[in-house]
Each structure stands twice: as structure tokens, then as C-alpha cells.
Amino acid sequence: MDTSMLIYPLLVFVIGFAAMIYMKTKGRNTKGNYVVAGRQYIKKFYPNLDVQQYEIVEGKITYSITAVHIPVLIAYNPSELYLFPVVRNMTGTKLNTPEGLEEHNEHIPVLSIQQIGITEKGDKMAFVVRGKETVINFSKRNSFNENQSEEVSNFLTTMAQAADN
């Protein structure tokens, strides 16, 4: 076997690894790209909606029996919230709908939320709407690897205030 044939798989591996590191560091140094991509994504489904009046944050929801956590785009304001299952594309610049979850977009008026529970660490929120419980897990970074701690804190504060009213 010719040893030069081993160079090609090794070269592909090195280029792929370098691209992965580049995307990770690119996300750490940016802020706001997820919000822009999220607003563009929402415009596809609701073209008449003024997306500028909504704040955007990312969480994870379990949609299946297999307990796979799917990233979900949360667009909210004090009176309503939208949940969109999303994944980022390979370049990390756009959001797409995961295959098989096209019908899981949800619009929830805040007044229809019957109960809200937030963990002390602020990494998980559960709420009940029409008898159906939804649990959202939050992480420090979103799919674009941007720090979203402040946005999560603002979201949980808004939901806690809505629960008090």
C-alpha cells in the first residue's frame, strides 16, 4: 500500500478540525448574530409579525419519547411567547427547522400559562398551558456559541413577573 494514500484522509481530518475550532472561536467573539438569525427565521413563518418587539433566547425542549433535547428558539415579550424548534446550519450563520419537527411551532399567550416554575440556578423553567407541561433547559451558550446568560436572566425575570400578575 502506498503511504501517500494516507495523506488524503489525514488532510481532510486536519482541515475539518481546523474549521471546527474556527467556528467555535468565531462564536465566542460575536454577539447578536443569533438574534438576527432568529428574527430572519421567524419572518419565514410570520411575515406580518413585527419581530423587533420580541426578545430572543435559546433553550432546549424534549419533543420525543427518546428524550432527545432539541434546541428551541424562544421569541417573547411580556404578553406572549413563540417556541420554534431550530438547528443551525453547517456554517453557523442561519437557523433551520429540524427534520420531522416542522409542525411543532407554538404560540403561547402569557395569560394562558397556568403555572410557572424556575430552578434556583436559573437553568430550567417549567410551565403548564392547558394541562400540558413544558420544560425548557437553558445553557450558558446558544447554538452560535454566543454567551446568552444575560438574555436567559431577562427571559426568566419576564416570565416570573408574568406569573405574579
Language model features by range: what are they?
Residues 2-79, 84:
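Anionic N-terminal interaction surfaces
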Residues 71, 103-105, 133-135:
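Short, mixed charged/polar active-site loops
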Residues 66, 77-125:
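Phosphoinositide-binding peripheral membrane targeting modules
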Residues 146-164:
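Short amphipathic C-terminal alpha-helix that caps PH/PH-like domains
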Residues 107-110, 137, 164-165:
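An amphipathic alpha-helical interaction surface
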Residues 45-54, 92-97, 137:
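A short, polar/proline- and glycine-enriched secondary-structure boundary/capping micro-motif
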Residues 131-151:
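Canonical phosphoinositide-binding patch of PH/PH-like domains
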